[in-house]
């Protein structure tokens, strides 16, 4: 029942659509959709370098970032990278913020969040607003640090990346694992936003917001593992 409600609700994200519309006319809004770091998946990210540069906490999206859509198991190929992140930051300083598990609209009693926590061994933040709408107080209360000291990792430009950039996080964009299990409207939205943000970045030269972590020597390789 919950999965059905989540799939239906995720077919429309008003805040994400508003972000896209704003980007058409406002350069500053476009910048919020551009990630600081892009990687195929979490395996490409240098978690120790991020920690050395001053990052104190890491926030992950769940679906198509760590798991298949609506699944509870880590994708096998990223399990090692997730363990590296937990080791670099400490398990208490890593959490999931999802538009499914933990979101009051679809998971008011937190039962799905509890299941995810048991399966993934990682806290799931309970929150009231769907990304990219922000609740910085929930994050600072959970982690005990400023949002500017956090990293946001996700697969969507107009939800995960915009959510993180709105709060001054360093944002990491990864590629989705699969469209299988997602509603057709979600796949269409991903296709559209990828091309829209790609146009902003390529043709308009839109850059992400400046971030202090890039002034640290640990940013030598832009927080990507050396190949």
Model-derived segments and their meaning:
Residues 65-66:
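Hydrophobic "anchor" residues
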Residues 61:
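Active-site residues of response regulator receiver
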Residues 2-56, 71-72, 78-152, 156-227:
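Asp-based, Mg2+/Mn2+-dependent phosphohydrolase catalytic module
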